[in-house]
Amino acid sequence: MSNPYISPFAKPVYVMLKPVGSVCNLACEYCYYLEKGKLYPEVKNHIMSEQLLEKFIKEYLECQTMPQVLFTWHGGETLMRPISFYKKALELQRRYGRGRQIDNCIQTNGTLLNDDWCRFFKENNFLVGVSIDGPQEIHDEYRRNKQGLPSFYKVMKGIELMKKHGVEYNAMAVVNDYNVDYPLEFYHFFKEIDCHYIQFTPIVERLGFHQDGTLLTSPEQQDANIKLAPFTVDAGKWGDFLCAVFDEWLKEDVGNYYIQLFDSTLANWVGEQPGVCTLARTCGHAGVMEFNGDVYACDHFVFPEYKLGNIHTQTLTEMMYSQRQLKFGADKYETLPTQCKECDYLFACNGECPKNRFLHTANGEPGLNYLCRGYKKFFKHVAPYMDFMKKELLAERPPANVMQWAKENKL
């Protein structure tokens, strides 16, 4: 696959798979998915059966209308299913694919990678997303195993094995309350390990208490007892972080190192699809299927109230095109407060992820994004550079010309 940022938006149905549910060999303190196992207290083994795997693959392929189909394997920790499981998946993809081009992306924490896994990924053209939050002292702040032991060196061993076997991979980094203070150390680390494709996600979670034992809350839940999780990134610092990394990237890395958020911002600047749901006008394009066939509206909305149904009783098309799911997607724009709809940067952020929209505006309207302050700071900072790159693209010139332009104008 030549492009590591494959956008699902052109496809009629896109559903991520959770072959082991929330089961993981790590216990990262900020993980939003680890507690989802509590939604299924009656089930001992949260493992997707091969029968369900076949049902999903057959139905998923039958409902596609495009010649290219993307499968995304997500966790929990995906490599806790054996290679034989994924070999079976490839066999089923070939059986039901009817000649389509099928791509596979898999997300992993990297600690279980070995030569066998890397050979398998290389031979079958998997794109691997590996979770790593920066250099050792930053990464190990939150990414530890169930015994509290650090994971950095195991992840780095996995990355070295992927390089050895020529596996295409990108880095998935979480920006939290700790590493947000070290933007340049964070960015330089990825350059030092020669990782050219980087996705970073700000962590924003709120903690409450629910009868099923879960702590994380959906944005609709408003209660005096709900508090921001201590690892949540500060909104203003998030903006400072983005500006600092952007300025460093602008010096010599445009066109060589690809940072998804910067690419998506530029796409919105020129009126194209951003390639990520958070910055798109609507969402609801990307559902998720749990180990038992339950389908939810989104990976970040795996709450009982956002369950669409189960593949054993409803088709994927019925669930993903249900009025409920269509409303979920349309509400991303429709429920924005007036402050957002009148904002100069609405086109760039589109309110960002609905899960982060739990604040009220100065006028008391609900639905303001917690990260608004940071994103505004970032968009204002990058506006002249985005304007220039937009002009270059429209003139069919490389946007990397912005580096020389910035130097000449001493920006």
What are these regions (language model features)?
Residues 24, 28-31, 277, 283, ...:
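Disulfide-bonded cysteines in secreted/extracellular proteins and peptides
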Residues 145-153, 160, 164-278, 282, ...:
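Radical SAM enzyme [4Fe-4S]-AdoMet core and its adjacent flexible, acidic
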Residues 290:
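Short, acidic, Ser/Thr-enriched surface-loop or helix-capping motifs
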Residues 1-119, 123-124:
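Conserved alpha-helical substructure of the radical SAM core
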Residues 58, 80-199, 206-208, 212:
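Conserved AdoMet/S-adenosylmethionine-binding subsite of the radical SAM
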Residues 302-411:
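Flexible mid-to-C-terminal extensions adjoining Fe-S/redox cofactors in radical SAM and related proteins
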